[in-house]
Amino acid sequence: ECRIFNACIPPNDRALYAGTVPVKAISDSEIIFIIGSNPRVESPVLNARIRSSWLKGAEVNLIGENSDLTYGYNHLGTNLIELDKIIKNKGKFYKNRKVLIILGQGIFCRTDGYEALEVVKKFKETLSAELISLHVAASRVGAMDLNFVSDYDYKSTVDWSDIILNIGMDEYDIPNEKFVIYQGSHGDRGANRADVILPGCAFSEESGIFVNTEGRPQLSLKACEKIGNARENWAIIRALSEKLDCTLEYNNLDELRKKLFSEYPIFATLDEVKSNSWVKSSKFTKNCLKVDLKNIWSDHYLTNPIARSSNIMATLSKNNKQISNEKVKS
């Protein structure tokens, strides 16, 4: 299960979790709706694209927490009521315009997330808009493409499990009665909680394929040698499968990738953004419209175990908080 914070992300709807256009579409957009996100914190590079588009005349609208995004925008409230109004008016003020919706984790990570997403989907259809989903975990889209999900939500999956293999997940407190095997590169919360630790390579110490927030598979190459007893993560999984008498059918990285490309062809399309089929919206009730959207991240510098183990990142985080506090006082 990869959907931490109980993120309501439907695995059969790639157009929703990976978007309908690449990030570069921001530059051509005339109207941008940001929903449940602070892109300045969650993705500064993407936020710079939004600012560039705004400087060229694009209209930016924010639905969610009021934030300093470095550019002007219309704040359309903290809930989905305004979207429903636009739907009822059939989007008449936005006809024949290039409209882009940027979804943040604030819309996914709520108890009624699936229903709230139906509001957004209906909104997109009404405006004939394009959509980009902004994820805060580098492995999220790739894990979704691998169908790395359970039949239940994240919390329920943890609750009914006795033994948990935790692969680099440090943002969730696992109950003490669970037996935890932790696989990761840095001694963060997950490692401190673990009963068994399997030291894996950091992303810079092994080759890998990452699928970014727009659904583009990207190949990364090893930049430096591993440290201590760390092993490449694919090799750890392979060795563990052998110990559990369910040996996986590959012996090296080439064999693994051949199997990966055969079963999940999307990973073979390196550096390409594939078009995704749109799943039509379903009906929603009015109850989800009044629920306020909350941003998930507030500190860009401490969003993952590698960043949290860095003295430089800790200093930047401290300085950023001081600047924010001074702005509040003034």
Located regions from the model:
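Non-catalytic alpha/beta scaffold blocks inside enzyme catalytic domains
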Residues: C2-L270, K327-S330
